[in-house]
C-alpha cells in the first residue's frame, strides 16, 4: 500500500512537472504542444510581437504588450524595445514610449502622445500557466486613462462562429464587427513634441484629411463584447482553448475591425490611475496537450513536374518523431490507385523547429496523376506531364494579374468589372515633407510648385499591390523583367485587348498584339511620360491622405477624376543616383524589345537611359548600378564606350560577382570569341570568380532542405527566392558546367508549394491544386485573390515558427507587389520549361 501511494505521488509530480512551462534553449516557453514567446518578434504593426501563444501548430494570440488605444491599427504608436533578457526561467523585456525615431517621420510616420514611460514586461511560468507582469516607471496621465492598457490580439481567421466565455457571460465571435459604438476623446489632442530633426517632418493634418482617418481612429470604437475578470477563448476545442485571468483590473473583449477593417479581436485590461508596480498582472493558461505531435507535412510542387526534370519531395515532421517508414508514390488512374514506388526517405536533419526528410523520384517519368503518402499524410494530387507548364501556370500573370493591376484603365472581364478607369486626374506636385509609405519630397527637386498640376502623367503603370501607388522601381523593374522574359524565350501570347487612348482593358479579348510586349509598353509609358513632364525621374505617384491609402474597393473610387482638387494624387521626385541608374538599366533593357513594336517609345526609353548614365558620377557607391546600366546600354546599342567601361570594372565585377554576375554573364559570353588579351583576361577572371561564388551558393543552399539559399525573416521569403532564381538562370544559361539548372527548379518548386510550414499552398494565386486564394490585393476586403498574383509567402514567427495564414490583411505573408512579385515567378516557369539555352541578345548592326 505504502509503495502504491509513493508511486502515485511520484507520477503526479512528474505529470505536474510535464504540464508546466519550461524556458527552452530557443528563448521561449514550451509545454507539450503549446509555446509562449515573449518579444522574440518585434513587428507590432504587422501583428507580430509581444507575448505570443502558439497552440498545436497554430498561432492563436499575439502582440501582448502595452498599447495606447483599445484597438490600435498599423499607424498607431508602438513602443520601442530597449532590452530583452531570457534567463533564470523568465523573460524580461524593457520597452518605452515614445519611439522618437518614428514620431511624425519615417517610412510610415506615427504621432505619439505626451507620455514618456519606460516599462518592463516579465513573463514566467506559474502553475500550469504563464504569469505576465507589467511594471511602469511613470503612471498613466489622466488623458490616457481608459486608453493605455495591456492588449492581447486574437487571430480572427480561426475564430469566426466560435465561442468565448467571460465570467458568466458567453458569446460567439462574429463574422463582421457589430455595433454598438463607443465615442471618446482622441489621443490626438495631446500630441507630443518628440521630433528629433532627423529627416523631414510629416504633416498629420494633411494625412488625416477629412472625416475618418486611420491615423486618428481611437475616437469611435466598438463597445466591448464583454467585461469581466476571467476570459476563455474556444472553450469547445481543447486544441485552441486559452484562458486569461486578470489579477489587477477588468478584462474587456473588443473587436478591432470596427475602426480598422484589418483589425483583430483584442482582449485588454486598462492601467489604473497611479499604477506603476504590478500595473498589469495576467495569468494566461492554455490547454496543454502533452501527447500532441506535429503531423507530417508533405511538400511538393502543387503544379507537378516535367518528366525529365528533377523531382524531390520534402517531408516536414515533428523533431521528436522517428521516421515512420517508407513513403509511397501513388499513381491515380480511372480504375483507382496504384503504388508505383516505395521510397525510404533520407533524414535531412533539423531546420527551424522541425526535422526534415527528403526523397527523390526523378526517375519516375511516366505521365499521369500522382500523390505521395507518408504515414497518415497525403500530398495534393500533382501531374507529371510534358505540358505541365503550358496552361494556367505562368500565363495567369499576363492573362489576369498585370491587366487587373493596370492604372488609368477600365479593366473588364466579360460580366466582371475589375475596376473602372482610375486616376485620370493625376497628378499634383507633392508638398515638401515626409509623407507615407516611404515617400519624402525634398525641396528644390522640381520645376513645379507644390500643388501645381503636372500634366501628361495619367498614362501607363500598374498599381503596386493594394496600395494603388506607382513606384518608379516597381514600374521600370516590372517592365524590365518582362522585357528579359520576352528576349530570352520569345513567348507568344495574345488574350487581352489594351487601348491606352480609350483607357480600356478587355481580358480574354485578343487584339493582335503580344501581351507581354504590351505590358512592357505599359510600364515604360508611366516612367517615360513622367520623366518628360518633370525633366527628371519621378519617385512615384501616391495618394495624399491616409484614408485614400488604406482604401478598400474600386481603384476609381480613390479620386473623382476631376483634375486640380484636393483628392488628386501627388507626384514625388528624389535625388537618388543608385535608383536613377537602376532605372536607366531597366529602360535600356525595355528599349530592346520595344523595337519594332513601339519604335517611338523604344527610342524614348533609350534616350533617357543614355542621359541618366551620362549624368552619373564616378562615385564608388554607385559603381555597381552604373555597371548594370553600361551592360544594358551595350547590349542595346553595341557602342564600344560602354564595353570599355565594363572591362575597366573587372575588379569590381569579380569581387562582387554575387551582385554583378548575373547581368554581366551575357557580356562575358559575347567576349568568349574575342581574341584580344583584355577580353581573354576578363573572361578568365570572371569565370574564376563565378566558380568561387558557386562554392558560396552551395554552402548557403545546404543550410535548408529546399536546395536554395533561404534565411527566413519576418517577411515571407518567396519574392527573394524568385529573384534569386531569376538571376541564377542567367548564370546557368551562360555557364551550365558551373551552375546546374536544378537550382532553377528548386526555386520554382519553393514558390509552387515545396516550402516550410503546415500550409503548403502555391504562392501563385490560382495556380496548382492548392494555392493562395486569399491575398492582400485590391480585392482583399472580399477575402479574394487575383489569378497570377504571387504572395510574399511563408513568414517566420521568430525564432522558429513558419506561418502562412489564410488571411487577406497580413502584407508580410499574402501581399502582391509589382517589380518582380509575379514577373520573376513567370520568368522562372518559362526558364524551367525551356529545354534549350536562350539566345544571347543580338547587338545592333553598325
Language-model segments: which ranges?
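Beta-strand-rich N-terminal accessory domains
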Residues: 19-88, 184-221
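Extended, loop-rich substrate-binding clefts of extracytoplasmic carbohydrate-active enzymes
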Residues: 68-140
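Acidic (Asp/Glu-rich), glycine- and aromatic
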Residues: 131-181, 376-388
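Aromatic (Trp/Tyr) and acidic
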Residues: 202-235, 303, 311-375, 388, ...
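Beta-strand-rich recognition/accessory modules
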Residues: 207-291, 832
